[in-house]
Amino acid sequence: MLGTMPATMPATNHSPETLHCLLTRHIIETGHAPGLQKLADLAGLTEEKTAEVLRKLEEIHGVILVPNSLRIWSLHPFALNPTSLWVSTATGGWWANCAWCSLGIWAAIKRDVNIFTSGGGEESSMDFSIESGQTRRKDLLMHFPYPPHTWWDNPFAPCANILFFSSEAQLDSWCLRHAHPRGSVLPIDVAVRLAELWFGDYASPDWVRKTPARAAEIFNELGLDKSFWKMSGSFR
């Protein structure tokens, strides 16, 4: 379970990381992101200062804002608009940006979840649970069409195409029909562990944006294909 935090944070703490924690916990508890005034109240800051820190969080890719505004579009792993992935517990539910993010929600909230989606985002429905880091659907695959060093060139298209599949044949057919490359394919157990290592601290006050070096450590720990998962300074 999530640890407790004060109703407001000390006004001397103006870090983007603190704002990230407040945003994440608000989304977990309510299912939506706070507006600027509410976020300022939670942070114990003025709206002007909150806007400044929020922009800094955007600069380090800790949040995605609606263009030309301070409205929050997405806070990984949470999508704040409808998607093809719904993650639920007995007490709440959230949209996920992609298959990886759906597992990331489990890792961030540290509770068993049920994930409802479809194979390749198409008509074959999937409904499975993650309980204590395990799923009975051992046949599932998670596909990353594009390597991580390209993810922030366009955070919407790569993320939307990270999907679950129930077989190699289904994946190959999907890639052919939609003209997406066959990238890195992870068995579900590896995908769950990747989500745990990546998103496990996202609701923590100790969260920091991962550096290329830390990302590479995680990928190497899981034995991921270095030709696909190699990191560079372009991972922003």
PLM regions and their residue ranges:
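Short acidic, hydrophobic short linear motifs in intrinsically disordered regions
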Residues: 29-42
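Short, Lys/Arg-enriched C-terminal cap helix and immediately downstream tail that follows
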Residues: 62-63
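Mid-protein regulatory/catalytic core that forms ligand/cofactor-binding pockets
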Residues: 92-215
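Extended, charged low-complexity segments
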Residues: 203-236
